[in-house]
Regions:
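Active-site neighborhood of phospho(di)ester-bond hydrolases with catalytic His/Asp-centered motifs
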Residues: 74-78, 100-113, 117, 133-135, ...
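Bacterial N-terminal signal peptides that target proteins for export
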Residues: 1-7
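Di-metal (Zn2+ and/or Mg2+/Mn2+) metal-binding site signature of metallo-dependent hydrolases
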Residues: 80-126
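Cap/insert and terminal regions of metallo-dependent hydrolase folds
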Residues: 199-201, 209-310
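N-terminal signal peptide c-region/cleavage motif recognized by signal peptidases
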Residues: 14-16, 20
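Core dinuclear metal-dependent hydrolase active-site scaffold
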Residues: 22-90, 94-96, 159-225, 309-315
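Cleavable N-terminal signal peptides
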Residues: 8-9, 19
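A short, active-site helix/loop in glycosyltransferases that binds the activated sugar's phosphate group
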Residues: 137-146
């Protein structure tokens, strides 16, 4: 399988559509890799992306495309969904009119993961019956609260309830299984998704509180999951403690990138290279490819997901 590093965002957006790097039946595309609010970040005037937009980042989202069936599935509807669908159209154009989405899978009800649904309504795309796959509490939240309830009423979206650890067939070549994980669940459950093809299993897990809490709840630790899966896109919100000035980061539960790397340091290089860090905060230095922290991630045998990356899930 081949993991191809994406081009610079500006080049991607103006270039003609790119063919897959190899013959590939099911392909994953990284559309964004930042934390919910992206970068430059609101209330952060010193962010270098204000002066250089090329340093900006959009919130975390991936797409999985079944090239055989001509179907495209979006994972997370972010506040940057307009730009991200334009990127997807450049990398893997839709076969027909409209948004060309055959389903949207949402992990939880925090702004960076579902707020982009607002663009599917009559003020935006005026979408027609896009299936939106969510857990039961999340479904009730969307159905019972505006403006999301209007999307349901007008059938811009059609809610497809999920059940934990129960796979759904997205297309002939793709099955998706939600796994509940510990996180702030004010309005919905939080899940990661295992995306299964005939050749691979991929974990998409942008948000959780603690590897230990998840292992205790599920009975499976992170190292075991790395062994059992082929690719893992995991929470990299913070690189280490001390990133947020004036904040007690012990009160902000997310696995730190340094801790995750240390936990997996005993695994072989072949296993460590399965892990790709995603959902990094604007304060996390791995957002910059040339940073010492990004170099450290590579030196330890891991990778950092970047917008424009593509990964073949079924050759």
């Amino acid at each position: 399988m081949q993991f191809t590093r994406g081009l610079l965002a500006l080049v991607i957006l103006i270039a003609p559509a790119l063919a897959p790097a190899e013959e590939c039946e099911v392909e994953l595309f990284v559309l964004g890799a930042g934390q919910d609010a992206g970068a430059p970040h609101i209330g952060y005037p010193d962010d270098p992306a204000w002066a250089d937009p090329a340093l900006g980042q959009t919130a975390t989202s991936i797409a999985v495309v079944d090239h055989v069936a001509g179907e495209r599935f979006l994972f997370e509807a972010t506040p940057h969904v307009t730009r991200q669908l334009q990127l997807l159209d450049t990398l893997a154009p839709a076969d027909g009119p409209g948004l060309g989405l055959d389903g949207v899978f949402l992990t939880h009800a925090h702004i960076g993961h579902y707020a982009g649904l607002m663009y599917f309504g009559r003020e935006g795309a005026g979408a027609d019956g896009i299936p939106v796959f969510v857990m039961p509490r999340f479904a009730a939240f969307l159905q019972g609260n505006g403006p999301w309830s209007q999307l349901v009423k007008l059938e811009n979206i059609v809610i497809q309830p999920l059940a934990a650890e129960t796979p759904v067939q997205a297309s002939k070549g793709i099955h998706v299984t939600p796994l509940t994980v510990p996180h702030r669940d004010e309005f919905s459950e939080t899940v990661g998704f295992v995306i299964v093809t005939n050749a691979s299993k991929t974990l998409f897990l942008p948000d959780l509180d603690s590897w230990d809490e998840w292992a205790q709840a599920s009975g499976i630790d992170l190292a075991t999951r790395v062994v059992e899966l082929d690719h893992l896109f995991v929470d990299a919100t913070f690189f280490q403690d001390g990133e947020l000035t004036g904040r007690d980061m012990s009160e902000i539960p997310h696995p730190r990138v340094k801790d995750t790397m240390e936990r997996l340091s005993g695994l072989s290089p072949e296993l460590r290279q399965k892990v790709r860090f995603i959902h990094y905060n604007h304060t996390n230095p791995i957002r910059f490819p040339a940073s010492p922290e990004s170099a450290l991630v590579s030196a330890r045998g891991f990778d950092v997901a970047r917008a424009g990356d593509r990964l073949c899930l079924a050759p």
